[in-house]
């Protein structure tokens, strides 16, 4: 499967929903187009994988029968997004967070105060759940697919390289994805 196949599969997307869902969205403050939705994808894409298409801020959890659940995500800022093939090497609930040395170097005012780490909780930037991306031979890449304490950043390129979801969607994805699941982060083209 390549990026073109996945994008071609998304061309036929149809939002599924109801009036009740739309009313819930208004009450929760989440835009209707940011809700997870089951969508058709190209046949032949294996179930049980995560595919992130950065140009559209979409993450797909693939299902049997050429279907996927589509989530809206925030992605890495220009120059910090890393395309590639990974696997889920760890999963954590309410993960602790420590900025990398590179993050502290880029923005010491924002990150130096957390050099010793921050415990998990509602103020933590990793949110309610995190999937840790690993590469064979490299181990932990420090890339994550995680929740966020800043839901307004979904649909934008603002992170330090990770893909982020609103917390309830991060919990939903976390509960579906097993360890060792394949993750594909496609290259940015725009």
Residue spans of the language-model regions?
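N-terminal targeting pre-sequences for secretion and organelle import
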Residues: 163, 167-190
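Generic beta-structure capping elements
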Residues: 91, 146-148, 188
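N-terminal export signals
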Residues: 4-23
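Short, conserved helix/loop micro-motifs enriched in His/Cys and acidic residues
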Residues: 143-154
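Gly/Pro-biased beta-strand-loop elements
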Residues: 28-143
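Short, cationic motifs built from Arg/Lys/His that form the positively charged side of catalytic pockets
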Residues: 3-4, 164
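Short edge beta-strand segments in beta-sheet-rich domains
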Residues: 81-83, 160, 178-180
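Short, basic/aromatic beta-hairpin or loop at an interaction surface
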Residues: 153-161
């Amino acid at each position: 499967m390549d990026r073109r196949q996945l994008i071609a599969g998304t061309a036929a997307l149809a939002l599924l929903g109801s009036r009740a869902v739309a009313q819930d969205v208004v009450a929760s403050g989440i835009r209707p187009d940011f809700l997870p939705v089951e969508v058709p994808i190209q046949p032949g894409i294996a179930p049980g994988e995560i595919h992130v298409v950065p140009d559209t801020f979409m993450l797909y959890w693939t299902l049997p029968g050429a279907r996927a659940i589509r989530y809206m995500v925030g992605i890495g800022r220009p120059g910090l997004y890393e395309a590639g093939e990974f696997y889920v090497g760890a999963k954590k609930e309410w993960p602790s967070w420590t900025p990398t040395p590179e993050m502290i170097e880029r923005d010491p005012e924002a990150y130096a105060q957390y050099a010793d780490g921050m415990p998990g909780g509602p103020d933590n930037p990793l949110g309610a759940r995190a999937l840790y991306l690993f590469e064979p031979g490299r181990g932990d890449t420090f890339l994550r697919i995680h929740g966020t304490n800043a839901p307004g950043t979904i649909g934008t390129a603002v992170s330090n390289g990770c893909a982020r979801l609103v917390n309830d969607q991060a919990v939903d994805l976390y509960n579906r994805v097993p360890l060792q699941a394949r993750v594909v982060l496609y290259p940015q083209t725009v």
